[in-house]
């Protein structure tokens, strides 16, 4: 068995894996234990009461966090004409059509989000094997295939997070950085949970949001008492 580092021993001693933490206590604990030499992200795992084997129970979408994610997001947009000018004005770093596709085929992937107008999907569709495995393929469900590319760019820059359940029915995403205030992290988490509740599949039965845990990049997960969150039902 691998020997625990001193840091991991401290984390294990401090975090009670059997306890549900009040949100403010959980954030305070994460901040106390975030001793890495960089500003760690605060990540969230949400266990959903869905059957991920059934396509009509999969949960996928996007929402803009009120306080952003703390990341500088570089955006590439496939579009043309007036939409191209609008995308540039909204702050997109890369805008194009076939020329942008050629850059990507050549391995130039200096972006975090890809957005496309519907008329550009004939070009983007040929990049599926490159963009798909990286989670970058535009999709209407996440608002990244849209006629209003300028709004999509602004959302991406404002701190939009995309979510999609994994094969175990768990959503993994980020809600900010450990140097955010407790209020910012709480409100970002509440916004995410509210969005997930709105995206609940009609056929899902029983308890929908089963467990919510937050952690830092290098830390352990802390389970949240959902009663301490203010979310839309």
UniProtKB/Swiss-Prot annotation:
Keyword Ribosomal protein: yes
Gene3D superfamilies referenced in this protein's UniProt entry, alphabetically: 3.30.190.20, 3.40.50.790
UniProt keyword terms in alphabetical order: Repressor, Ribonucleoprotein, Ribosomal protein, RNA-binding, rRNA-binding, Translation regulation, tRNA-binding
SUPFAM superfamilies assigned: Ribosomal protein L1
Domain of life of the native organism: Bacteria
InterPro entries assigned to the protein according to its UniProt record, in alphabetical order: Ribosom_uL1_bac-type (IPR005878), Ribosomal_uL1 (IPR002143), Ribosomal_uL1-like (IPR023674), Ribosomal_uL1/biogenesis (IPR028364), Ribosomal_uL1_3-a/b-sand (IPR016095), Ribosomal_uL1_CS (IPR023673)
A Gene Ontology cellular-component term: cytosolic large ribosomal subunit
GO biological-process terms attached to the record: regulation of translation; translation
Spans through the membrane: none
Gene Ontology molecular function terms on file: rRNA binding; structural constituent of ribosome; tRNA binding
Family, per entry: Belongs to the universal ribosomal protein uL1 family.
Protein purpose: Binds directly to 23S rRNA. The L1 stalk is quite mobile in the ribosome, and is involved in E site tRNA release. Protein L1 is also a translational repressor protein, it controls the translation of the L11 operon by binding to its mRNA.
Subunit structure: Part of the 50S ribosomal subunit.
Name of the protein: Large ribosomal subunit protein uL1
């Amino acid at each position: 068995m691998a020997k625990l580092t001193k840091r991991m021993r401290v984390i294990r001693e401090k975090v009670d894996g059997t306890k549900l933490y009040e949100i403010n206590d959980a954030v305070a604990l994460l901040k106390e234990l975030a001793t890495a030499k960089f500003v760690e992200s605060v990540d969230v795992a949400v266990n959903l009461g869905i059957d991920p084997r059934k396509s009509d129970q999969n949960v996928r979408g996007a929402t803009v966090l009120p306080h952003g994610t703390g990341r500088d997001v570089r955006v590439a947009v496939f579009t043309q004409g007036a939409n191209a000018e609008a995308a540039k004005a909204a702050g997109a770093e890369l805008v194009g059509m076939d020329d942008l596709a050629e850059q990507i085929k050549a391995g130039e992937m200096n972006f975090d989000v890809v957005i496309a107008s519907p008329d550009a999907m004939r070009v983007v569709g040929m990049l599926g094997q490159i963009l798909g495995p990286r989670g970058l393929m535009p999709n209407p469900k996440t608002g990244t295939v849209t006629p209003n590319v300028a709004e999509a760019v602004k959302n991406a820059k404002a701190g939009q997070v995309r979510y999609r359940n994994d094969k175990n029915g768990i959503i993994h995403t980020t809600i900010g950085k450990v140097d955010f205030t407790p209020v910012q992290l709480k409100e970002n988490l509440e916004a995410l949970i509210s969005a997930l509740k709105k995206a609940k599949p009609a056929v899902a039965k029983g308890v929908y949001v089963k467990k919510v845990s937050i952690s830092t990049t290098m830390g352990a997960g802390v389970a949240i008492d959902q009663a301490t969150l203010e979310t839309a039902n």
